[in-house]
């Protein structure tokens, strides 16, 4: 019974440590005048962005309006229930919001966060350019961790809000994803 208690206590300590790490990214604002931002894809409903993707896109739009030299890499392939790629959906949304097509690069093969970051590298000098990653707030810490593991040198997170009542669910799920990532070989 003592071993069970020790294991449970260790598990709780690890869980709270991971949640603390995730919490460090919840309000990440990035820095001004980044060379690139990578907007991580998220579910598309038909041809329209999901609520989570719309939050990411609104954050990207605001950043790009405030930083007119920044280029966006829109990263996301086409899921099974999606009529178009996530990248194409993002392009349409941002163009409609007034962002010039010349500032938008589409990466349309990725289906995971790791692939988003790996496949987006080809569009920039990821070891020297200053790069921001836009994703929902609960996902920022792990995304930046993955970027650094993928060789990005000058990278920061930019948190899109998550106003969903499911935020606590996402935070718990992200803790398990982060634990899995920390066990994954680089």
Question: Where are the regions a protein language model picked out?
Answer:
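Transmembrane alpha-helices and immediately adjacent membrane-cytoplasm interface residues
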Residues: 1-21
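A structural signal for short, hydrophobic/glycine-enriched beta-strand patches
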Residues: 17-172
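A transmembrane-helix-recognition feature enriched in membrane-embedded lipid enzymes
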Residues: 167-186
């Amino acid at each position: 019974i003592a071993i069970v208690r020790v294991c449970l206590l260790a598990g709780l300590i690890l869980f709270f440590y991971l949640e603390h790490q995730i919490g460090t990214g919840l309000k990440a604002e990035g820095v001004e005048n980044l060379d690139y931002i990578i907007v991580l894809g998220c579910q598309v409903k038909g041809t329209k962005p999901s609520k989570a993707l719309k939050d990411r896109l609104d954050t990207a739009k605001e950043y790009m309006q405030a930083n007119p030299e920044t280029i966006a890499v829109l990263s996301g392939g086409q899921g099974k229930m999606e009529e178009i790629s996530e990248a194409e959906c993002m392009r349409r949304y941002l163009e409609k919001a007034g962002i010039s097509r010349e500032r938008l690069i589409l990466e349309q093969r990725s289906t995971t966060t790791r692939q988003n970051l790996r496949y987006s590298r080809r569009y920039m000098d990821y070891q020297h350019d200053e790069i921001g990653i836009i994703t929902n707030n609960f996902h920022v810490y792990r995304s930046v961790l993955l970027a650094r593991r993928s060789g990005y040198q000058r990278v920061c997170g930019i948190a899109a809000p998550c106003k969903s009542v499911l935020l606590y669910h996402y935070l718990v799920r992200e803790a398990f994803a982060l634990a899995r990532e920390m066990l994954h070989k680089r």
